[in-house]
Amino acid sequence: MARSTRAKQRLRKGRKKVNQDHLSVKKLTVAAVLMAMNIIMSISALSIPVPGGHMYLNDLIIVTAAILLEPFYALLVGGVGAFIGDMLFYPAPMFVSLVSHGLQALVISLFVHRWMKSRPVPASVIGAAVGLVISVTGYTLGRAYIYSTPAYAAAKFPFQILQTLVGSALALLLCWKCGVVKLYEREFKRG
């Protein structure tokens, strides 16, 4: 009798481990797809020309990833995805992108998944607002340093705010009004 009970317990532990591994693979796959989308959004052909450069829609993907994914995965999608995109298409600000978008995604995800877990919609809005400040500040300081001209950074400043604001607003609408969060959660509850 004791042997069969132990065998059942081992079997349950084994099933639980398989399910956890399956979830990890699924989360990694979602993160990889979002990272690929982030890289693709770095193409200048998909951007809007503005004085001082281009306005990209990366923030839509970064904020969406941060709302859906745990902080580690969000950091990878935001920071590493933007870094690779810049490295492939315009390498000068790639380290600025790594830090700015990485911190932006990390902070949003921490608000949603750790600090205000019981209230995800307000957490997303607050996180996106804080992420906007991080991204805009990081890019403004980074551009001033990289290009050695604060005037260049100042010229791009309002468009950087607009880029992050539009991307964040679209991500919030996509996640909460269009049901992406519910779809994502339903898929992961199913295992």
Q: Model-derived features: where do they sit?
A:
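Loop-helix junctions at membrane interfaces
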Residues: 1-191
